[in-house]
Design a protein with these regions (language model features):
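N-terminal beta1-alpha1 ligand-phosphate binding loop
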Residues: 2-35
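Residues at the starts of beta-strands that form the adenosine-phosphate
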Residues: 6, 38, 90
């Protein structure tokens, strides 16, 4: 079976800098150029509408804004409210923030999602001060720092998504997680 990987991009539209939707659109456009993914953008404020998409997902890509060396309370609430949906699915991250580029938020999210039986992948994209690359129209101009890490992350995410989807089809994760 060689069907597309159903990838859900999760972002917060209410982040203080209002850059998450901009970055999500950029990532969605990059992913749309790749034949292996079917992509869906999901705003964390739309929790009820999210469930069908999360249930069908093979993989997740989370945008993590770093706030006080961690991630937002809204994202934490979203993760907790849809806990069962993460099981045996890979998760990748695009972190953003000040000089750290969101690396602290990503580190915390990896721990939390591993506790939810998700599989956080190693590669991530970290964007230091991404709002500095917004043009006058509010369009994010892709920095060279993002191209190679994004490609590497998507290759790994595709591999993990297919491997875990195959494993879930052979034996549902619920049967081995108890």
């Amino acid at each position: 079976m060689n069907c597309k990987v159903k990838l859900v991009l999760i972002y917060e539209s209410n982040d203080e800098e209002a850059i998450a939707p901009v970055l999500a659109r950029w990532a969605s456009a990059v992913i749309a150029q790749r034949a292996e993914f079917e992509c869906c953008l999901l705003d964390t404020s739309l929790r009820r509408a999210a469930l069908p998409h999360l249930t069908r997902a093979d993989a997740f890509l989370i945008f993590a804004s770093e706030q006080s060396h961690g991630y937002s309370a809204d994202l934490k609430a979203f993760i907790d409210q849809v806990a069962i949906r993460w099981q045996a699915r890979p998760v990748a991250f695009i972190g953003y923030g000040g000089e750290s580029g969101g690396i602290n938020a990503i580190g915390q999210l990896r721990q939390v999602l591993a506790g939810q039986h998700a599989v956080p992948i190693c590669s991530a994209v970290t964007l230091a001060n991404p709002w500095a690359l917004l043009d006058e129209d509010g369009i994010w101009r892709e920095a060279d720092q993002a191209r190679i890490p994004m490609a590497r992350m998507l290759v790994q995410l595709n591999w993990w998504a297919r491997a875990l989807r195959s494993a879930r089809e052979k034996k549902p994760y619920e049967l081995v997680s108890q």
